[in-house]
Amino acid sequence: MKAQLKKFILLSLNACDGLPMPQSALVGAVQNLARPGQPTKSDVEDALKAVEREGFCEGVSDEFSETTWTLTTKGIHQARKL
């Protein structure tokens, strides 16, 4: 399931066309795409951290809002192959 969640993360971020996506929206989008599997928030966040470690996306957080996520160049390339 983790591989599928990682794929859905890339697809969701790619659909934003470069705009940062808030983490709560990303988690919700991935959970919707993964139906009927019903991954938990923790499952999605674990997959998100794995995608970040692999260099496909990066998250930015500050004191004013939640973490937002975007694809890296490597992530854009990978997402376009899916």
Which role fits each region the language model picked out?
Residues 1-21:
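Short alpha-helical segments that sit at the start of domains
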Residues 64-71:
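Minor-groove-contacting beta-hairpin "wing" of winged helix-turn-helix DNA-binding domains
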Residues 19-32:
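Short acidic, hydrophobic short linear motifs in intrinsically disordered regions
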Residues 33, 62-64:
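Cationic, hydrophobic amphipathic alpha-helical membrane-interacting segments
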Residues 37-53, 66:
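Short amphipathic alpha-helical interaction segments
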Residues 52-62:
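A short, conserved structural fragment
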Residues 73-82:
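Short, amphipathic alpha-helical interaction segments positioned at domain boundaries
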Residues 1-5, 55, 69, 81:
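Intrinsically disordered, low-complexity serine/threonine- and proline-rich regulatory segments
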